[in-house]
Amino acid sequence: MTPLQLSEQGKIFHSQIRHLLQQLESNLAELRGGSDYAQRKIKIAAAHSLSLGLLPSIISQMPPLFTWAIEAIDVDEAVDKLREGQSDCIFSFHDEDLLEAPFDHIRLFESQLFPVCASDEHGEALFDLVQPHFPLLNYSRNSYMGRLINRTLTRHSELSFSTFFVSSMSELLKQVALDGCGIAWLPEYAIQQEIRSGQLVVLNRDELVIPIQAYAYRMNTRMNPVAERFWRELRELEIVLS
């Protein structure tokens, strides 16, 4: 028996009702003279790598008007939370479906996934993309970055690899790469310090560098005033990733 599911219109209505209830709760808290935490709270669901690589920069550039409730989750789960009204907005990657109604979006930045590995005592790469059966540190197959990397590997059938480690989290893959366990495709914003220090080496093959784009998404229905203010502030930001 197929469980009942909301239609797309039903999901939009559900999201609208959630925002109205949140605003009502905020108004009641203000009337009671209670804590302003609920009144200023921004709920964001973010892809794992963006929660570490992007959110600290955004929070530091925002005026002190908000309190933050951040959940780092898989991309697909973040989209579900947005559709169901459980998040004011999500920080995720390029998704054609989310670039159209009933959603609104802000493009935050562009970056790249570089194939990298640890260096030896002479600063040389421990592994090479042309060696047979190089150990691959990959993202989960159904994750956004996993899909990008697997498509690239399929196009470049000359690459010979053996998957050694799989995770949905960039930071975990980076640590395993730093430990000298294999080659990983990692986002530029997550490895700048390690590249500068020589701990990680970029394996220079331009055709294997993968472009990525990060976006903020929301439903295009009206949110509560605090969330609307956050969205306006976010549009004005110039994102700088260190």
From Swiss-Prot:
GO terms for molecular function: transcription cis-regulatory region binding. Induction: Transcription decreases during mid-log phase and is maximal during stationary phase. InterPro entries: LysR_subst-bd. Keywords: Transcription, Transcription regulation. It holds the Pfam family LysR_substrate. It comes from the Bacteria. One of its GO terms (biological process) is regulation of DNA-templated transcription. Belongs to the LysR transcriptional regulatory family. Represses EHEC virulence expression. Down-regulates expression of LEE (locus of enterocyte effacement) and iraD genes, and alters AE (attaching and effacing) lesion formation. May regulate transcription through interactions with another HTH DNA-binding protein. This is HTH domain-truncated transcriptional regulator QseD. It comes from Escherichia coli O157:H7.
